Curated annotation (Swiss-Prot):
The entry's keywords: Ribonucleoprotein, Ribosomal protein, RNA-binding, rRNA-binding
Subunit structure and binding partners: Part of the 50S ribosomal subunit.
The keyword Nucleotide-binding is annotated on this UniProt entry: no
Function: Binds to the 23S rRNA.
Classification lineage: Bacteria, Pseudomonadati, Pseudomonadota, Alphaproteobacteria, Hyphomicrobiales
Family membership noted in the UniProt record: Belongs to the universal ribosomal protein uL15 family.
Name by which UniProt lists this protein: Large ribosomal subunit protein uL15
InterPro entries hit by this protein: Ribosomal_uL15 (IPR030878), Ribosomal_uL15/eL18 (IPR021131), Ribosomal_uL15/eL18_sf (IPR036227), Ribosomal_uL15_bac-type (IPR005749), Ribosomal_uL15_CS (IPR001196)
Organism this protein belongs to: Methylorubrum extorquens (strain PA1) (Methylobacterium extorquens)
Domain of life of the native organism: Bacteria
Xref: Gene3D superfamilies: 3.100.10.10
Length: 169
């Protein structure tokens, strides 16, 4: 047996029916599409239409909502900040702000601020000025001898400040 000799078993596949090739074929003229109407034309299928049966997207219940007041925060882990300090991208003596994080390349753009998370090891004594911080992050920073100050500015103010930091880089 060779790869080019592999075939389906006899009768395992049904021959393709060519439609619209004369009335003698049994699938001529309208080609199994019925008569006239949108569904008889080419290229038209009605998305989500299940032949009059209640479609899936209407059978399932609605869930949840989108909170228009939610803050879109960048999440930054302590380990990532420590890597930037070790690489010389962040000044360990200056305050770690949103602008400094953008300039160091830790976050690509400031959204509505930054939330500091406690994943990773922090060995440098740093002072953070962020929008929010988790309990584990605050404990880790204070254990390393640093401090965390939470400040909130409107998203537009953060974005403007961060863009200024990138422009001056």
């Amino acid at each position: 047996m060779k790869l080019n000799e592999i075939r389906d078993n006899e009768g395992a596949t049904k021959a393709r029916m060519r439609v619209g090739r004369g009335i003698g074929s049994g699938k001529g003229k309208t080609g199994g599409r019925g008569v006239k109407g949108q569904k008889a034309r080419s290229g038209v299928s009605i998305k989500g239409f299940e032949g009059g049966q209640m479609p899936l997207h209407r059978r399932l219940p609605k869930r949840g909502f989108n909170n228009i007041h939610a803050h879109d925060l960048n999440e930054v882990n302590l380990g990532r900040v420590q890597q930037a300090v070790d690489a010389g991208k962040l000044d360990a003596n200056a305050a770690v702000t949103v602008e400094a994080l953008v300039k160091a390349g830790i976050i690509s753009r400031a959204r509505d601020g930054v939330k500091l998370l406690g994943v990773g090891e922090l060995t440098s004594k740093l002072s953070f000025e962020v929008t929010r911080a988790s309990k584990s992050a605050i404990e880790a920073v204070e254990k390393a001898g640093g401090s965390v100050t939470t400040t909130f500015a409107a998203g537009v103010a953060h974005r403007g400040a961060a863009e200024g930091a990138v422009a001056s880089a």
